[in-house]
Amino acid sequence: MNIKPLADRVLILPAPAEEKTIGGIIIPDTAKEKPLQGEVVAIGNGTKDEEMVLHVGDQVLYGKYSGTELEHDGKKYLIMRQSDVLAVLG
């Protein structure tokens, strides 16, 4: 990975969206819900006022409209401020 977030930002690899429903109905790309969970793959150095509490490998939840989408090496990522992350999972 050669993307290094700056300041209090984190780079997240979103979890894959569901391909089909429990009943077996295939969901087209246009109807899929945006995932709200992902894995932290890179973190910034923090700021003078805010220390980074997230770590690479953390599974996190974030808001539906959080972050900026970007694509790198064929994968889609989100970059957002640490404060946009709502929770760390288990």
Swiss-Prot record:
Its main location: cytoplasm. The keyword Cytoplasm applies. One of its GO terms (biological process) is chaperone cofactor-dependent protein refolding. GO terms for cellular component: cytoplasm. SMART domains: Cpn10. Keywords: Chaperone, Cytoplasm. One of its GO terms (molecular function) is protein-folding chaperone binding. It comes from the Bacteria. It is found in: Cytoplasm. Together with the chaperonin GroEL, plays an essential role in assisting protein folding. The GroEL-GroES system forms a nano-cage that allows encapsulation of the non-native substrate proteins and provides a physical environment optimized to promote and accelerate protein folding. GroES binds to the apical surface of the GroEL ring, thereby capping the opening of the GroEL channel. NCBIfam families: PRK00364.2-2, PRK00364.2-4. PANTHER family: 10 KDA HEAT SHOCK PROTEIN, CO-CHAPERONIN GROES. Belongs to the GroES chaperonin family. Heptamer of 7 subunits arranged in a ring. Interacts with the chaperonin GroEL. This is Co-chaperonin GroES. The lineage of its organism: Bacteria, Pseudomonadati, Bacteroidota, Bacteroidia, Bacteroidales.
